[in-house]
């Protein structure tokens, strides 16, 4: 990822396999989710090291081919829940063949890399132009029940407000999301108590807002989707000026 996103304003984690037990010891009421490196020559050894730590979920990022997914699913061999981070145009264009591999428990659409893969300027363009809708249709048709997309900032923040993004998860039937760096940028917030406060209050606010989204009618969700598309167009237009 460091090579792929060298000049991007993005999160590049420095975690290692040795960090997994440390996280497990600190987490009491949540699943342990580990993202591996993409398939490479030493992938098998890396994955075995990850699985030895007994995570609940293992995610494969930045794959482009059916063969890579086959390698991943076969190597995990039922020892953890499998998650695919779909973030390349190559993978998106052959999603039916990828899903047909079987053994895939969940798929997350990574809008950051995917937007760059398609030559877009703003990561939520794929949400506005129907790309995410088309992928979700394929997930549903092929029996993938657990899926999600993008990142969510705290309420009241983000270039594209979280208040517009969260209803899209409900419209599309998404049941998972990743908190964006804008939710809590730990490179700028160094105090652990402050980080804890941000997460506690921020997640609680999102949960409360989710209740409102769950009660929205189809018309209200559709109207929000239209407003989101218009807002994305405005953002992209401003980027081009």
Residue ranges with predicted function:
Residues 1-241:
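Expand to "…catalyze enediolate/carbanion chemistry for C-C bond making/breaking, isomerization
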């Amino acid at each position: 990822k460091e090579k792929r996103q060298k000049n991007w304003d993005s999160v590049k984690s420095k975690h290692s396999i040795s960090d997994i037990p440390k996280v497990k010891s600190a987490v009491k009421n949540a699943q342990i989710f580990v993202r591996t490196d993409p398939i490479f020559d030493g992938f098998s050894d890396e994955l075995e090291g990850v699985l030895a730590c007994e995570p609940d979920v293992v995610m494969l990022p930045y794959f482009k081919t059916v063969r890579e997914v086959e390698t991943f699913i076969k190597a995990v061999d039922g020892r953890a829940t499998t998650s695919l981070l779909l973030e390349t145009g190559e993978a998106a264009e052959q999603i039916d063949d990828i899903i047909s591999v079987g053994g895939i428990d969940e798929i997350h659409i990574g809008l950051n890399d995917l937007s760059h893969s398609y030559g877009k300027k703003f990561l939520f363009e794929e949400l506005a132009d129907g790309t995410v809708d088309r992928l979700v249709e394929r997930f549903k048709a092929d029996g993938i029940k657990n899926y999600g997309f993008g990142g969510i900032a705290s309420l009241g923040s983000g270039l594209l407000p979280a208040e517009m993004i969260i209803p899209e998860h409900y419209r599309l039937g998404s049941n998972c999301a990743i908190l964006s760096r804008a939710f809590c940028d730990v490179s700028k917030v160094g105090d652990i108590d402050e980080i804890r406060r941000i997460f506690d209050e921020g997640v609680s606010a999102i949960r409360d807002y989710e209740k409102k989204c769950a009660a929205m009618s189809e018309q209200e969700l559709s109207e929000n989707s239209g407003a989101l598309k218009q807002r994305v167009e405005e953002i992209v237009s401003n980027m081009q000026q």
